[in-house]
Amino acid sequence: MKYRLYSEGLSISNDLNSIIGQQSTMDTDIEIDEDDIMELLNILTELGCDVDFDENFSDIADDILESLIEQDV
């Protein structure tokens, strides 16, 4: 199963044409496989980060950033 993560408000550009054309990246979204998410969570756990998320992974980016800030990584 793939989950969709939204970059709205993050101003993250994943597309060179977007950078060159100076188009807004506010509506860009990324699909991530559940296995990739679990692998990332395992790596973060090994680094000492405590990341909680709901079953839809909807707040995972905020949780990861908050945990990293708390760890001073």
UniProtKB/Swiss-Prot annotation:
Lineage: superkingdom: Viruses
One Pfam family matching this protein: Orthopox_F14
Record-linked InterPro entries: Orthopox_F14
Induction conditions: Expressed in the early phase of the viral replicative cycle.
Alphabetical keyword list: Early protein
Family of this protein: Belongs to the orthopoxvirus OPG058 family.
Name of the featured protein: Protein OPG058
Species this chain originates from: Vaccinia virus (strain Copenhagen) (VACV)
Gene name linked to the record: OPG058
